[in-house]
Amino acid sequence: MSGHTPYVIDSQQAHRLLQQIDVPQILRKLFRDLAAGQAVQPAQQLVEFPQGAGDFINYLGVLADDQVYGVKTSPYIVREQGPLVTAWTLLMSMQTGQPLLLCDAGELTTARTAATTAVAVDALTPLDAKRLAIVGSGPVAQAHLHYARGLRDWQDISLYSPNVNADKRARLNDIEPRLRIVEHLEHALEDADVILLCTSSATPVIDPSQLRKPALITSISTNAVRAHEVPPQALNDMQVYCDYRKTTPGSAGEMLIAASQHGWDAGQIHGDLAELLSEQTPRPTYARHVFFRSIGLGLEDIALANALYHLHHKAS
C-alpha cells in the first residue's frame, strides 16, 4: 500500500475495532489534553445546501501529542422518504502531511456521543445516585446504556421510547438485563437522579420544571437546525455544563435560543469537560437541576479514529 493512500475502514470494521478500545478512557485523556493546551478544538463549520436541500457539518480537531489532525464531515440530505445522514472521518499526519485513515464515522459518532455523556455523568453525578432514566431507544440510546450502566450502583434503570419494537427491546435487554422499559415518560422520570436524553428530536422532550427533585439531565445533538431536547428558557433555572465552553454555546439549539430570547448568557456555564477532568471547576451542588449539553467535538472523532488507526496498523 502506498504511503500516500489512507487505510479505509468501513462501518462493520469500525464496529469490530471499537470493541477493542476503552472509549471513555480515550476521551478522558483527550479532555485533559485540551485543558493542558495539547489539543485544539475549532468551532464546528455548518454549510447549508442551496434551496433547503440540507446541510453538512465539519468537525475539526488537532491532537498535538499524537501528531495528528483531521476532520469529520457529516451531511444531512433532505429527501422525500426522510433525511439521510452519513459521516466520514479523515485522519492526517502532522509529520508527513499525508492521509492516514478514511473511516466511516457512523459507529465512531455513536460511540463517542454516548461515551462523552458517560464521562460527564461520572464527573457530575453524586456517588450515591441510584436511579438512571434513558429517553430514546435507537443505536445512540443503546450505546448510552452500554457506557452508563456501570458508572454507579444503580438500583433502577428505566427507559422510555415511543418506538420500542421487539428487536430494540431484545438489544436493550442484552446490554442490561435489569433494564425496565416503561410505557409512559413520567414513569421513567419519576425520582430519577440522572436522565439521559438520547433522541433525534428537534424540539423539547421533557420539561425539567415538572421533575420532583433535582437531577442531572444530559442532552445530545442532531443535525436539525437549532435542535434542542429541553425548553430553552429552562437554562436559566439549571446549573449548566457542556462538553467545551468555547464551541458549544455557538451550536447548541437551546443555548442559541435562550441567549436570543430568554436573557441567558454563555457566561452562566459552570464548566466544561476539560475543566471538570482537570479539576479547574467544582462539581455541582444539586440545589437545582444540573444540565449537561454536548454537541460532539471533532477532537472526539479524531481521537477515536487515531485509536482505530493504531489498532489496524498493529494488526497489519
Predicted regions and their residues:
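N-terminal ligand-binding/catalytic initiation module
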Residues: M1-T110, A118, D128, I302, ...
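Glycine-rich Rossmann-fold phosphate-binding loop(s) that bind the pyrophosphate
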Residues: S137-G138
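NAD(P)-binding Rossmann-fold cofactor-contacting core
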Residues: G150-D174
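Conserved beta-strand elements of the Class I
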Residues: L132-A133, V290
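Adenosine-phosphate binding glycine-rich loop
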Residues: H228-S316
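N-terminal Rossmann-fold NAD(P) dinucleotide-binding loop
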Residues: A141-Q142
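Rossmann-like adenosine-cofactor binding region
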Residues: I175-Q261
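Short helix-loop-beta connector
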Residues: L124-R131, D153, R212-K213
